[in-house]
Amino acid sequence: MKMNLQKFAGKTNVFPVLDNEFKAGAAKDSATVIADMETFNVEFSNGIETWTPMDTEGWQRGLMTSKGIKITLSGKRNIGDTGNDFVAGKVYKNGHDAEGYFEWKHPDGTTISWTNAIFDVKNIGGGDSTSVGALEVEINGNGKPTITPAV
């Protein structure tokens, strides 16, 4: 897959973070946008095995052998919103019950999705007494994602 990182949504130059879209649900056909999310962070982890053979005169060699993605979303708990309720509903789940469909649509239209992403809910209403209740979740990729390039 080749993404042109200089062209997003048919435009050139920079883009606002709000152009990213996140959906969650039991399956792709029932997934909806998660309302009231304010911030997101993505963390790519890469497994690199290194070794230092004698024939490289002390210079290390390496090979990337694994990948992982973790997406953190933070916002407000919106009771009654389908996507927000789906995520919050994972808070007391374990095992495969903590999994679900998750999709990240990039500003250029590329989508990355998992049918069994792991929802690690961190907060479903906390904050100080004058704050709006929070919803915070880390979505961990679970296996190789489906990557669909923008058309």
What are these regions (language model features)?
Residues 9-78, 116-136:
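Solvent-exposed edge beta-strands and adjacent loop segments
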Residues 57-117, 124, 130-133, 143-151:
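Extracellular/virion structural assembly segments
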Residues 7, 39, 108-110:
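Polar/charged alpha-helical tracts
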Residues 137-141:
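C-terminal edge-of-domain segments
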Residues 1-8:
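N-terminal leader/targeting segments
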